[in-house]
């Protein structure tokens, strides 16, 4: 199996080094193409349409850093760096959870969405932490979770988001929705001496879905789809609102 690894925390992060070790369990060939700096929060954004150039630095035969976003890295890996299409894309291991609205902001998720858009099975992995990051649960359980996911498979337009709890005792695996944060949580601004501001965002969760299960000590697996369309609302609007809008172009 050929595996492409990327992330949003940067080429030198501990998480990507760990993911390389995890991938050794089932990969015949491992490629790493990751941002040269921390690009957390980049989502599925692209630098290449607006930058005149993007740098690619080769560190070893199959390891590269890129002066772009996680999604840029996947595109560059598939179209420039790799000589074969990977069988699987792994993104992470992210420092911190990817649940609730984080899924929309996450470069870890954005990278695998870029892979799924090209019909490549793609998994994002994240390690929850509180005060200090502890990779133990990822080290122990990631190889098993990845192997099981590859075995059962999933639709091409879906990515898998896996979160490992910070709790020492893992209770098991739960398939769960992403959950919700109170996005209007406390956002504080602290002015720095140079006139810039430091931001701190404290958000409360709804107590549902993946967020709650992680707190209880479960590994969570959340299928995330590329297509954001709400088909129930779309069909309702087609049936009940079409007449209201029919005269706009007259």
Curated annotation (Swiss-Prot):
Designated gene of the protein: surE
NCBIfam families (UniProt xref): PRK00346.1-4, surE
Keywords: Cytoplasm, Hydrolase, Metal-binding, Nucleotide-binding
InterPro entries (UniProt xref): SurE (IPR030048), SurE-like_Pase/nucleotidase (IPR002828), SurE-like_sf (IPR036523)
Family: Belongs to the SurE nucleotidase family.
Protein name: 5'-nucleotidase SurE
SUPFAM superfamilies in the cross-refs: SurE-like (SSF64167)
Catalytic activity, reaction form: a ribonucleoside 5'-phosphate + H2O = a ribonucleoside + phosphate
Subcellular location: Cytoplasm
């Amino acid at each position: 199996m050929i595996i492409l690894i990327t992330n949003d925390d940067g080429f030198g992060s501990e998480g990507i080094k760990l993911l390389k070790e995890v991938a050794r369990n089932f990969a015949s060939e491992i490629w790493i193409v990751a941002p040269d700096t921390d690009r957390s929060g980049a989502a599925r954004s692209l630098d290449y349409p607006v930058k005149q150039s993007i740098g690619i630095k080769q560190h070893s035969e199959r390891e590269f850093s890129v002066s772009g976003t996680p999604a840029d890295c996947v595109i560059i890996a598939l179209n420039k760096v790799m000589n074969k299409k990977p069988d699987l894309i792994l993104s992470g291991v992210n420092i911190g959870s990817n649940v609730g609205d984080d899924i929309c902001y996450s470069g870890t998720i954005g990278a695998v969405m870029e892979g799924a858009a090209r019909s490549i099975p793609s998994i994002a992995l994240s390690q929850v932490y509180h005060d200090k990051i502890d990779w133990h649960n990822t080290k122990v359980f990631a190889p098993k979770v990845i192997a099981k996911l590859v075995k059962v498979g999933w639709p091409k337009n879906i990515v898998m988001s896996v979160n490992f709890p910070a709790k020492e005792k893992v209770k098991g695996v739960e398939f769960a929705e992403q959950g919700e944060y109170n996005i209007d949580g406390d956002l504080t601004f602290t002015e720095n001496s140079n006139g810039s501001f430091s931001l701190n965002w404290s958000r409360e969760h709804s107590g549902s879905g993946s967020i709650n299960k992680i707190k209880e000590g479960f590994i969570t697996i959340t299928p995330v789809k590329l297509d954001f369309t709400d088909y129930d609302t779309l069909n309702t609007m087609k049936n009940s609102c079409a007449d209201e809008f029919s005269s706009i172009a007259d």
